Swiss-Prot record:
Subunit structure: Heterodimerizes with CVC1. Interacts with major capsid protein/MCP and triplex capsid protein 1/TRX1 at the pentamer vertices. Interacts with the large tegument protein/LTP.
Free-text function comment from the UniProt entry: Capsid vertex-specific component that plays a role during viral DNA encapsidation, assuring correct genome cleavage and presumably stabilizing capsids that contain full-length viral genomes. Participates in the interaction between the capsid and the tegument through interaction with the large tegument protein/LTP.
A Pfam entry, by short name: Herpes_UL25
Membership in a protein family: Belongs to the herpesviridae CVC2 protein family.
Gene Ontology terms: biological process: symbiont entry into host cell; viral DNA genome packaging; viral penetration into host nucleus
Keywords linked to the UniProt accession: Capsid protein, Host nucleus, Host-virus interaction, Viral genome packaging, Viral penetration into host nucleus, Viral release from host cell, Virion, Virus entry into host cell
Protein's UniProt keywords contain DNA damage: no
CC annotations in GO: host cell; host cell nucleus; viral capsid
Name of the protein: Capsid vertex component 2
Residue ranges of the TM segments: none
Organism in which the protein naturally occurs: Human cytomegalovirus (strain AD169) (HHV-5)
Subcellular localization, as worded in the UniProt entry: Virion; Host nucleus
């Protein structure tokens, strides 16, 4: 056959379009598919079906990827539009009128100021070693003469700038919020402590930097933790553990423990919208609604926190009367603040039944019984309806208002809008609020048991933390003696250590960080509660053992292991061998110990004595002055010369 014959005379069936050079044109992908079909046909069996299924999956996968890309593009465009709208609204709100407000006149205009090295604010060099007097902490640091601007000068400067000036433009030269120092007061006879971003981290750094020829010990509990970690090479290297013959603790180990204690009540889930402190404020506001009659009711969580010194004594008296009239069984160890969890409960967050715990979980909790009687909590899903309330509703023909939901919406609408959770249905918030209330009650009972101006038995002073030069320049030398501040002293039998903490520590911290939790405020309280729970032999994985032999026949519950839930959580945080669920389970076990320990400490007749025993035997705490610092810091150093 001649090569010049045209293609249609070839004895070949034509499947592809002809080419001018008499060559069949076939795409590469088609040839690859033909080869695959031939190989599958030759092999036989189930290969052909597998190849066909792979092709179907690839086709659907391409379609799903295209749909996903389209949805992502649409979402990004929508987000960009919303950001633009918010930016426009902010620009409109920040524009100033021609006549400045009186509040603006009182504020000097922002000027670039020279900052001292390591301070971040002007004039900080006049305050030695991060301490400040109480008067200056409240009224603000004294400005230099060149920085003081009269109100008339401020008006003139504002008028010269023109009506188009904005608040953003005026404050563009202010230091960042993270660099602005804050002031916390712990005891009445010590100056305020100034910090910038991390309160306890900066205290620990200052403490170890000032130590040159001495070191610190923090009690037997910390030494046992060091001894347990020393035998494991990895943790020995991570926490810089050395010198097992003394009680000194490395800075890395101390920061690791404090970080674990701060996160006890911080629940690591994306859908947790409330802190335990905010949940407790909602419960307290609903409980003390009679207190607001004749005065302006609180409209924010910060206002309720300011009323803690008035609300907690009333709550403590009602709890005492409720315990005295208690009917029915009590939890193991006479714990009136216990939760009757199911034996297989591993996670704190209820995952089934519409975020409801097992029926009967709150039956033996004294605060729940009290709130039921006061009408704060009317009905919990899974519990029987109160007959008296049901009869009143039938007779009156109307349902009573849910007091807790009303106050929750009033306090949280500014933060959450319309998505305020209902505590009786999302019961993790109810449980965290009850636990936080128990912690606040314990704080009030313990801190107001004695005055810081009484004769001391301990040797710790603030100079041990920050140096004697810093304390001497801060207002009250030595950190031991000083005049009583008006309204907070121990005269006439009134001890107001807790009131001082609320005003100068809890309130400022919440104003700085509204998401703060009780364990972040008082890691020492969390450590005491966890230690009490571990010493009792209670184990969250063996709840049925605790429920069976706690308070009957004088049975003693033995501790089966020398576990340390704080150390376990430290390992889970820094180890790659733990998955997310396992890490969450370890955190929740620590949280369960914290709840159980708080209940045990509050259920004894004199909580102050039990706390004092724990503090003196394990944490170097000997008096109320040292206890206040331990509760706030989570540790109490004792100086040891090298």
């Amino acid at each position: 056959m001649s090569l010049l014959h045209t293609f249609w005379r070839l004895p070949v069936a034509v499947f592809f379009e002809p080419h001018e050079e008499n060559v069949l044109r076939c795409p590469e992908r088609v040839l690859r598919r033909l080869l695959e079909d031939a190989a599958v046909t030759m092999r036989g069996g189930g290969w052909r079906e597998d190849v066909l299924m792979d092709r179907v999956r690839k086709r659907y996968l391409r379609q799903e990827l295209r749909d996903l890309g389209h949805r992502v593009q649409t979402y990004c465009e929508d987000l960009e539009g919303r950001v633009s709208e918010a930016e426009a609204l902010l620009n409109q709100q920040c524009e100033l009128d021609e006549g400045p407000s009186p509040r603006t006149l009182l504020q000097p205009p922002c000027r670039p100021r020279s900052s001292s090295p390591g301070t971040g604010v002007a004039g900080a060099s006049a305050v030695p070693h991060g301490l400040y007097s109480r008067h200056d902490a409240i009224t603000g640091p004294a400005a230099a003469p060149s920085d003081v601007v009269a109100p008339s000068d401020a008006v003139a400067a504002s008028a010269a700038a023109g009506a188009s000036s904005t608040w953003l433009a005026q404050c563009a030269e202010r230091p960042l919020p993270g660099n602005v120092p804050s002031y916390f007061g712990i005891t009445q006879n010590d100056p305020f402590i100034r910090f910038h971003t991390d309160f306890r981290g900066e205290v620990v750094n200052t403490m170890f930097e000032n130590a040159s020829t001495w070191t610190f010990s923090f009690g037997i509990w910390y030494y046992r933790l060091k001894r347990g970690l020393y035998t494991q090479p990895r943790w020995k290297r991570v926490y810089h553990l050395a010198q097992m013959d003394n009680f000194s603790i490395s800075q890395e180990l101390l920061l690791g423990v404090v970080n674990a204690l701060e996160n006890v009540t911080v629940y690591p889930t994306y859908d947790c919208v409330l802190s335990d402190l905010e949940a407790a404020a909602c419960l307290l506001a609903a409980y003390g609604h009679a207190l607001w009659e004749g005065r302006d009711p609180p409209d924010s969580v910060a206002t309720v926190l300011g009323e803690l010194p008035q609300l907690l004594p009333r709550l403590a008296d009602d709890v005492s009367r409720e315990i005295a009239a208690w009917e029915g069984p009590v939890a193991a160890g006479n714990n009136y603040y216990a939760y009757r969890d199911s034996p297989d409960l591993r996670y704190y967050m209820p995952l089934s039944g519409g975020r409801h715990y097992h029926p009967g979980t709150f039956d033996r909790h004294v605060l729940v019984r009290l709130f039921h009687k006061r009408g704060v909590i009317q009905h919990l899903p899974g519990y029987g309806t109160i007959t008296e309330e049901l009869v009143q509703e039938r007779l009156s023909g109307q349902v009573r208002d849910d007091v807790l939901s009303l106050w929750s919406r009033r306090l949280l609408v500014g933060k959450l809008g319309r998505d305020v959770p209902v505590f009786v249905h999302e019961q993790q918030y109810l449980r965290s609020g009850l636990t936080c209330l128990a912690g606040l009650l314990l704080l009030w009972k313990v801190t107001n048991a004695d005055s810081v101006f009484a004769p001391r038995t301990g040797k710790f002073t603030l100079a041990d933390l920050l140096g004697s030069d810093a304390v001497a320049g801060g207002g009250l030398p030595g950190g031991r003696a000083g005049g009583e501040e008006e309204g907070y002293g121990g005269r006439h039998g009134r001890v107001r250590n807790f009131e001082f903490l609320v005003r100068y520590y809890i309130g400022p911290w919440y104003a700085r960080d509204p998401a703060v939790t009780l364990s972040q405020l008082f890691p020492g309280l969390a450590l005491l509660a966890v230690t009490e729970s571990v010493r009792s032999g209670w184990d969250p994985s063996r709840r049925e053992d605790s429920a069976g032999g706690g308070d009957g026949g004088g049975a003693v519950l033995m501790q089966l292991s020398k576990s340390n839930p704080v150390a376990d959580y430290m390992f889970a945080q820094s180890s790659k061998q733990y998955g997310d669920l396992r890490r969450l389970e370890v955190h929740d076990a620590l949280l369960f110990h914290y709840e159980h320990g708080l209940g045990r400490l509050l259920s004894v007749t004199l909580p102050r004595h039990r706390v004092s025993t724990l503090g003196s035997s394990l944490f170097n705490v000997n008096d109320i002055y040292e206890l206040l610092y331990f509760l706030v810091l989570g540790f109490l150093p004792s100086v040891a010369v090298l």
